[in-house]
Amino acid sequence: MDPSKLAKLQAGARIGGKGTPRRKVKKPSKSAMSAADDKKVQGALKKLNMQNLAGIQEVNMFKEDGGVINFRAPTVHSSLPNETTAIYGKAEEKTLSEILPGILNNLGPESLTALRQMAEQLKVSEGEKGADAQADDGEIPDLVEKFDEQD
């Protein structure tokens, strides 16, 4: 065999220094880390004596700024004596307009009125922001002197 080819192969196979091969560190995968987190959550839920609520397909949480936190197929646990509910899973932030068509047929009459009030508040707050931006433009004075020049 050609000595130059042999030297190239040996140089490529050498991992560590001074003749001892070093082992590569195996990093834990993200799924293993999430499994450990799930075990911690399950332990905390057992301490509170929480029961799993099956059959919940979607959870929407409405924020004050008009956004919505949406959970598709979440895991929901609840404990009535402790007055505690735990919702966990993959969350997505959405706007009210994105989520509205899908939830209209699930809402009752009280929820519809509350939703209308939230939509009106959102429109009013957006209108105020636009008015503030226009008012701020009018308050900026014109530059009449050159302050960086010395007389």
From Swiss-Prot:
Belongs to the NAC-beta family. This is Nascent polypeptide-associated complex subunit beta. Residues 20-29 have a biased composition (Basic residues). GO terms for biological process: 'de novo' cotranslational protein folding; cotranslational protein targeting to membrane. The lineage of its organism: Eukaryota, Fungi, Dikarya, Ascomycota, Taphrinomycotina. Residues 35-100 form the NAC-A/B domain. Residues 1-38, 123-151 are annotated as: Disordered. Keywords: Cytoplasm, Nucleus. It comes from the Eukaryota. Part of the nascent polypeptide-associated complex (NAC), consisting of ucp15 and btf3. NAC associates with ribosomes via btf3. Component of the nascent polypeptide-associated complex (NAC), a dynamic component of the ribosomal exit tunnel, protecting the emerging polypeptides from interaction with other cytoplasmic proteins to ensure appropriate nascent protein targeting. The NAC complex also promotes mitochondrial protein import by enhancing productive ribosome interactions with the outer mitochondrial membrane and blocks the inappropriate interaction of ribosomes translating non-secretory nascent polypeptides with translocation sites in the membrane of the endoplasmic reticulum. PROSITE patterns: NAC_AB. InterPro entries: BTF3, NAC_A/B_dom_sf, Nas_poly-pep-assoc_cplx_dom. It holds the Pfam family NAC. It comes from Schizosaccharomyces pombe (strain 972 / ATCC 24843). One of its GO terms (cellular component) is cytosol. It is found in: Cytoplasm; Nucleus.
